[in-house]
């Protein structure tokens, strides 16, 4: 059973639909006991850092997520769900994130010829040992929609990178905690393979 955390985040239904298409058993919930009993947990997200943290707090999910990530349950953050795993974001100065992984979320720098938000397909440079990308070609294309990006404090957790006006840490893996800045649920067959790899952990 894979639990998708429901905290009024935008891309929840598309993540659920992608997993169901893979034959996975999925539960959408904001109930802590249900989430803690799941075999795997996904934190989706589209929206602002500060508002998302307020919602997680309001629904009593901050401690739940910290318990899940601390007890060895495979956990996947998607898009804003990646950003929330870190302590702070340029998007909402003063708001405190989950602070589960080391790093910060920065605004994508402006550059002539590049639109922000970054919306579209980019290729990834993936580490060969990255478990989420097992069985994929070296530079798969995935779909991004974001104005802020991760700069991880520990290069050792970076599983994939991309370039868009700057060097972007596009995916991280640390023990049982995985996260993607891009949207696997919108990334065609490559994205489904990534979700299948997570479901198979």
Question: What is the role of each PLM region?
Answer:
Residues 139, 173-177:
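Beta-strand-turn-beta hairpins that frame and shape the catalytic cleft
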């Amino acid at each position: 059973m894979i639990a998708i955390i429901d905290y009024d985040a935008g891309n929840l239904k598309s993540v659920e639909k992608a997993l169901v298409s893979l034959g996975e058993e999925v539960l959408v919930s904001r109930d802590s006991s249900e989430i803690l009993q799941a075999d795997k947990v996904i934190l989706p997200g589209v929206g602002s850092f500060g508002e998302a943290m307020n919602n997680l707090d309001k629904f009593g999910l901050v401690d739940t997520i910290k318990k899940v990530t601390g007890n060895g349950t495979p956990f996947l953050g998607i898009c804003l769900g990646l950003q929330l795993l870190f302590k702070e974001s340029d998007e909402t100065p003063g708001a405190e994130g989950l602070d589960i992984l080391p790093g910060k979320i920065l605004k994508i720098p402006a550059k002539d010829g590049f639109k922000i938000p970054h919306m579209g397909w980019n290729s990834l440079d993936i580490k060969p040992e990255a478990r989420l990308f097992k069985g994929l070609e070296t530079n798969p294309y995935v779909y991004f929609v974001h104005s802020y990006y991760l700069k991880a404090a520990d290069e050792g957790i970076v599983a994939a990178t991309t370039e868009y006006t700057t060097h972007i840490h596009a995916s991280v893996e640390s023990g049982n905690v995985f996260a993607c800045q891009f949207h696997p649920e919108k990334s065609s067959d490559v994205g489904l393979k990534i979700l299948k790899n997570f479901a198979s952990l």
